[in-house]
Structure formats: structure tokens, C-alpha cells
Amino acid sequence: MTAASLEAAIEAAWEDRANVTPASDAVREVVEAALELLDSGKARVAEKIDGQWQVNQWLKKAVLLSFRLNDNAVIDHGAGGAPAFDKVPSKFSGWGENRFREAGFRVVPGAVARKGAHIGKGVVLMPSFVNIGAFVDEGTMVDTWATVGSCAQIGKNVHISGGAGIGGVLEPLQAGPVIIEDGAFIGARSEVAEGVIVGEGAVLSMGVYLGASTKIVDRQTGEVHIGRVPPYAVVVPGAMPGKPLPDGTPGPSLYCAVIVKTVDAQTRSKTGINELLRD
């Protein structure tokens, strides 16, 4: 089946999604084909074409349809060796040493990646969670307790620090996925959600929270960015002055993010990847 015919079949199933059940064998066939493309990295929910990110909505729809097709079942070999009860199997179900070596990435005990997520060569998954439809490109580190949400797009040589959250698209339903471009650094306990794009080489310090409406203020120029961090920007938490209250007293300040500088040699020395960890 060609990509065009697969897309058309998914779109048709989506229009009739209220009637999709575990007995919908024809729909299952095309949805599983789409999920295999996502799992292998041969297709992705968003891709950069001529410098612009384009979302393949039909692939996101395939992910959503899969939840109507599958019943919950016991999944062996869950986190910590405990069984789980879910609709999505582990990406690594049935894998042996040869399959892991062929894939070329590391999976530390406690890491969870669901079937339908793509993990590139040289990636390190510390005890973390990578959801269905996500794309994690080569050389990236997903550190301890970090989460890569459904359909999120993570570039090459990215560092997602401990406890950081990369939001998904499934609930609440989002039009586009979060995108972290090549070489970006996401600081510990930061959160990027609601389709925000973090540009190539950008650095978020610890505890930066970015959603679709978060103001990202350039301290030098006063320019305000919303929904996108410029490439190579260094971003820290900040606050905007609040509007006065009705009685004229100062109102509460509101959270924002602040671009304090552009990545320089000092920044790179603190946020660069360690090639020793990628072997």
C-alpha cells in the first residue's frame, strides 16, 4: 500500500471513528501499518520541509484510532519487572540482545518506551518515559524521570534533563506536537507543552515552563515570542509586571520566560553532550 492510499484509508476511518471497534479488521490493518512506520522512523507526525515544520495529521489520527482498536491486556516485563495492564505494548516486547544491538541505543532499567515511538541510534534512555508516536533522533539523552509525550519530535543530540516534561498531543488534544530541534538543551524540571517549538541549539535553564500562550521576552530587544524559542537563545524563568488591581494597588506579576543571551562558549561548556556516554 502506498503512503497516499494509507493516508486516505486512515482519513476515512477517522471520519467513521465512532464505529471503530476491536472487530474492525480492515481499520486495524491500516492503523498497524501506520504505527509500524512511526515505530521504525520511516514516517513521523511532523517533519521539516523547506525550513518549515509540517504536521502529518493523518499519522496522529492513526495513533488515536489505535486506542479504539485495542482492548487492555496484561503486559509482562513492565517497569521494575512488574506487569502492566494497557492497550499499548512495550516497544521492546520480544527483543533480545541482537535486536538491541541492531537498534543501536541504550535502555537503562526502568525506562519505558511504547510501541509506535521511534528511538534513533546513539540515544540514551535513562529511567524515563517515551510515549507512542514520539520521535527521538540520534544521539539524544532522555535523562532520569523525563517524559517525552505522545507524538513529540525530538531532534539530534538533544539533552532532556532529569524530570523535564515534553508534552504530548493526545490529551488535551493538540493540533501540533511539541518540537525540540537539533542540539537543544532542556533544563531539569522544565516543561514544554502545547505545540511549542524550541529552536536549534536553544538552552532552557532549570524550571522553565512554556505553553502556547507563554510570553518569551528578549531582554535585549524587548521582542516577545509566543509559541517558539528562537535558535540558540538562552532562556530562564521570569515575570511580567501585573496590571493594577481595581483599587489601584499593584497586581500580581505573571510568569514569563526571558531570553537573557545567545548561546556562547561558556554556555556550550555547561550544556554540551558527553560522547563517552553515547558508545
From Swiss-Prot:
Q: Which residues bind substrate?
A: R106, D143
Q: According to the UniProt entry, what is the EC number of this protein?
A: 2.3.1.117
What is the catalytic activity of this protein?
A: (S)-2,3,4,5-tetrahydrodipicolinate + succinyl-CoA + H2O = (S)-2-succinylamino-6-oxoheptanedioate + CoA
Does the entry feature the keyword Acyltransferase, yes or no? yes
> InterPro entries from the xrefs?
DapD_Trfase_Hexpep_rpt_fam, Hexapep, THP_succinylTrfase_dom1, THP_succinylTrfase_N_sf, Trans_hexapeptide_repeat, Trimer_LpxA-like_sf
Provide one Gene Ontology biological process annotation: lysine biosynthetic process via diaminopimelate
Its primary localisation, in coarse terms, equals cytoplasm
Which Gene Ontology molecular function entries are recorded, alphabetically?
Answer: 2,3,4,5-tetrahydropyridine-2,6-dicarboxylate N-succinyltransferase activity
Q: Keywords in UniProt for this one?
A: Acyltransferase, Amino-acid biosynthesis, Cytoplasm, Diaminopimelate biosynthesis, Lysine biosynthesis, Repeat, Transferase
Of the GO CC terms on this record, one is:
cytoplasm
Top-rank lineage group of the source organism: Bacteria
Any keyword Amino-acid biosynthesis?
yes
Pathway given in the UniProt record? Amino-acid biosynthesis; L-lysine biosynthesis via DAP pathway; LL-2,6-diaminopimelate from (S)-tetrahydrodipicolinate (succinylase route): step 1/3
Location within or outside the cell = Cytoplasm
Checking NCBIfam families in the record gives: dapD, PRK11830.1
Q: What does the subunit section of this Swiss-Prot or TrEMBL entry state? A: Homotrimer.
Give the protein family: Belongs to the transferase hexapeptide repeat family.
Its recorded name reads 2,3,4,5-tetrahydropyridine-2,6-dicarboxylate N-succinyltransferase
The source organism is: Novosphingobium aromaticivorans (strain ATCC 700278 / DSM 12444 / CCUG 56034 / CIP 105152 / NBRC 16084 / F199)
